[in-house]
């Protein structure tokens, strides 16, 4: 099975312009993401998908591969579709979508999501990662997307609110969504033809589109958190963790 990992990266960000190139311990953030992903077993190729020449030059400077995408891509999945088309991937090829602001991604987590497709070929077209929340402040923070899943680890819902709600107790596990996706090339094509979902639009969570239209999202629970860098203040947290990693 061919497995291509794509790292979509945009230069523009309202909260943190130039985020992919922000230095973390002497390297641009996108380099940390790329190099940690490269440690995962089972990958055929890794590309950064971007529409910005500054990011392209930075990636090529450390020896990474880049595919230039349409600057007018409406969403992250549209950018992935553009990259897949340019790379000429086959319908049954596996595509991993790793966000460019996850410099702490653990390669074992990437291997987990590949294993899901190896063990259950043809049973689903999309999978993602979850992590049991250990920091209390994340429980009610809408920045941290929560998720629930059934006994077969099929996603039931994603929300910015705390789910599930414990009517009589607060002592129960709550899982957050880690922004890593895997799908077959064929499913990406299917997904991009689906109309915007009502819940997707309400929560501003693109993955809800798949659930709203009856598609299965398989979940793997990671033993490793992968916090995203959303603000310059998050850089200090990453630097401290990378220093001891």
Swiss-Prot record:
Top EC class for this record: transferase
GO biological process entries: lipopolysaccharide biosynthetic process
SUPFAM superfamilies (alphabetical): Nucleotide-diphospho-sugar transferases
Domain of life, per lineage: Bacteria
Swiss-Prot/TrEMBL keywords: Cytoplasm, Lipopolysaccharide biosynthesis, Nucleotidyltransferase, Transferase
Annotated InterPro entries: Cytidylyl_trans, KdsB, Nucleotide-diphossugar_trans
EC number: 2.7.7.90
One GO cellular component term noted in the UniProt record for this chain: cytosol
Gene3D superfamilies: Spore Coat Polysaccharide Biosynthesis Protein SpsA, Chain A
Pfam families: CTP_transf_3
Primary localization class, coarse: cytoplasm
Pathway where this protein functions: Bacterial outer membrane biogenesis; lipopolysaccharide biosynthesis
Annotated compartments: Cytoplasm
Catalytic activity reported: 8-amino-3,8-dideoxy-alpha-D-manno-octulosonate + CTP = CMP-8-amino-3,8-dideoxy-alpha-D-manno-oct-2-ulosonate + diphosphate
GO terms for MF: 3-deoxy-manno-octulosonate cytidylyltransferase activity
Function description: Activates KDO8N (a required 8-carbon sugar) for incorporation into bacterial lipopolysaccharide in the Shewanella genus.
Family: Belongs to the KdsB family.
Name the record gives this protein: 8-amino-3,8-dideoxy-manno-octulosonate cytidylyltransferase
Annotated source species: Shewanella loihica (strain ATCC BAA-1088 / PV-4)
């Amino acid at each position: 099975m061919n497995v291509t990992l794509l790292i979509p990266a945009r230069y523009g960000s309202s909260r943190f312009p130039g985020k992919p190139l922000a230095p973390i311990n002497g390297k641009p953030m996108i380099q940390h993401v790329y190099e940690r992903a490269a440690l995962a077993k089972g990958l055929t190729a890794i590309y950064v998908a971007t529409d910005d020449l500054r990011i392209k030059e930075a990636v090529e400077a450390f020896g990474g591969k880049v595919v230039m995408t349409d600057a007018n891509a409406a969403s992250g999945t549209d950018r992935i579709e553009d990259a897949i088309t340019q790379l000429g991937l086959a319908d049954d090829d596996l595509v991993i979508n790793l966000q460019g602001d996850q410099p702490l991604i653990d390669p074992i987590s990437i291997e987990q999501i590949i294993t899901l497709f190896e063990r259950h070929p043809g049973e689903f077209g999309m999978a993602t990662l979850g992590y049991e929340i250990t920091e209390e402040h994340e429980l009610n923070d809408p920045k941290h997307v929560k998720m629930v899943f059934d006994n077969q680890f099929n996603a039931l819902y994603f929300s910015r609110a705390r789910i599930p709600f414990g009517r009589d107790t607060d002592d129960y596990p709550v899982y957050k969504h880690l922004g890593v996706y895997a799908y077959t090339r064929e499913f990406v094509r299917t997904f991009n033809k689906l109309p915007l979902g009502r819940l997707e639009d309400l929560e501003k969570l693109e993955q809800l589109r798949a659930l709203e239209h009856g598609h299965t999202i398989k979940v793997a629970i990671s033993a490793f958190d992968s916090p995203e860098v959303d603000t310059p203040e998050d850089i200090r947290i990453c630097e401290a963790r990378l220093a001891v990693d």
